[in-house]
């Protein structure tokens, strides 16, 4: 006869303490691939801009070969597709403004949309929702209202097609070859909270999960792709890929919307065990011994639209500023 462990919510250490601050983000936080391609042309076309938000996340933990479990789910609320497209527009406008400030020639939409390659593009319906394989997050991705949402192989796992599908890649190559330009597609994705868990243990008794609210740039999902080609069938490309989580700030309030556990039942049993009444008063009716310990909770991160817009603009400015530094460092001879 022994005490039981209960599933519990454990407040994690401040998420910002384990992230890079937005004003401290640098190229050291990015993986750079084939930046020399940026020097192939002074002309740049930006046919799409991808903006995403994590809409749902969850974490689970267990201990004692499954006898104790904890589960937490969280949703982002107060955001719709129209708001996301407006945020995508603001981020895209910042990118184009900074790109023009580098002195590069930024092609207009009429020229881009009239190109042969553009006509061959297969856009992804927006908003695009994706729960990547072996990932608890569900991400919504959009483009500005007036731009197509384009997906290519390097966008995996936020993709609606196989990495071996070369249709859009060849269309972008055709666009680059026809317009004699670089083609760039940035992607900016933010999450709303950091979730932690004690994992799934065979011998450990307890199971803990926790949540820390706060927007941050998502590694891997946040990046910038570029392409250059002389013919449609073959080209070259490069990328800047965020490798670290970058804290952006708060844009709303975290609210617990549900909780379900048998912690009180477990504590009653543990108090009975610790009291030794089972030995000193063997004829006393004992409380029922729980066979499992569980703790389930749900949360909502309720967005303030104004705060979210400010946070997205701040994240876009910081991210795009680094991109422009790489573009300026790789100019045509």
Where are these regions (language model features)?
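A structural "domain/chain start" motif
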Residues: 15-333
